[in-house]
Amino acid sequence: MKPLRAPGRLLGTGLAGALLLGLCACAEAAGSASADHEPKDGSMATAPPAPAAPGLVTAVATVLQENDGPPELCLGGVAESFPPQCGGPEITGWDWNAVEADSAQGTIWGEYTVEGTWDGETFRLTEATSAPTDPTAPSDDPRLDPDNAGAVGRDLSESETQELQDEVFTDLGGLGGWSENGYVWVTVVYDDGSIQSYADDRYGADRVAVQSALRDVE
């Protein structure tokens, strides 16, 4: 274990551009957003799916354990405090003796590239290595192409876009979210395409762009 040191930056998660969002400011606004974004067929949408991954998945993320609690895989933001604060799904098979880590005040943590399986609730580790020095890579998502802009920018005002963003973030259990290129973006733990389909049905096509924090190992 490395000697105690204070983190000098926000511990990254390897997810470019994701900004933490609070819950919707008030129930009235959330209710209004729901009324404006009914499912396409007019029926009440079911709860969003929580798919399991069919094979191995990977991510660059902070792993953190507080006192006697289980190790957690922090796929969202990490608070720049000392010790840092974050939360996420439980990670099983983790061995702090097998990796370098920092510790303070009953908390132990580090940033790693992890690989394992995801059953929809728990991440089961198969391999962990040190995080890359610069984990950020340019995204090749076609929805970022200006020629492929989404419908939000032309259909909704700025306040309506923010309202939709808040609702989507809460509805999908987002880890991070923002608006860009005519889409409301939201990062979830894992999506096999079913969460994107749910979002399209509930909010309309070309409005919500779902990104998966856990990526399938190719």
Over which residues does each language-model region extend?
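OB-fold and OB-like single-stranded nucleic-acid-recognition modules
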Residues: 2-22, 26-218
